[in-house]
């Protein structure tokens, strides 16, 4: 039963350990991308109409990143998992501390 009292501290330490790895993943994701920091916007739509045979999709895929990358989804999943694990462990800790003498329904 002694291990259950350490459960909130264990989840806190694990959460901090996972958070310390998050900047490493962000650095790898930003260094591995081939995107440039300059953004080129056409002055008007006539510029695109001047090049009817050019496929802009590969360049747009290289330069325009939309949504969350794979590291962002992993970090979000780990964060939510740790939150729910902490809540579950806190509830288990409360249930373990509940004695038969105490009333479950406390008067307000």
UniProtKB/Swiss-Prot annotation:
It is a single-pass type I membrane protein. Coiled coil: none annotated. One of its GO terms (cellular component) is membrane. The keyword Metal-binding does not apply. Residues 1-27 form the signal peptide. It comes from the Eukaryota. Keywords: Glycoprotein, Membrane, Signal, Transmembrane, Transmembrane helix. Residues 28-71 are extracellular. Residues 93-108 are cytoplasmic. It is found in: Membrane. The chain crosses the membrane at residues 72-92. Pfam families: TMEM213 (PF15192). Glycans are attached at residue 34. InterPro entries: TMEM213. PANTHER family: TRANSMEMBRANE PROTEIN 213. This is Transmembrane protein 213. The gene is TMEM213.
């Amino acid at each position: 039963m002694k291990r259950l009292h350490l459960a909130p501290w264990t989840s806190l330490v694990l959460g901090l350990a996972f958070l310390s790895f998050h900047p490493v993943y962000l650095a790898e994701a930003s260094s591995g991308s081939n995107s440039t920091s300059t953004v080129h916007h056409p002055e008007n739509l006539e510029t695109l109409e001047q090049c009817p045979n050019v496929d802009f999709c590969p360049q747009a895929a290289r330069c325009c990143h939309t949504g969350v990358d794979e590291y962002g989804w992993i970090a979000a999943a780990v964060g939510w998992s740790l939150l729910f694990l902490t809540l579950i462990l806190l509830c288990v800790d409360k249930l373990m501390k509940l004695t038969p003498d105490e009333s479950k329904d406390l008067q307000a």
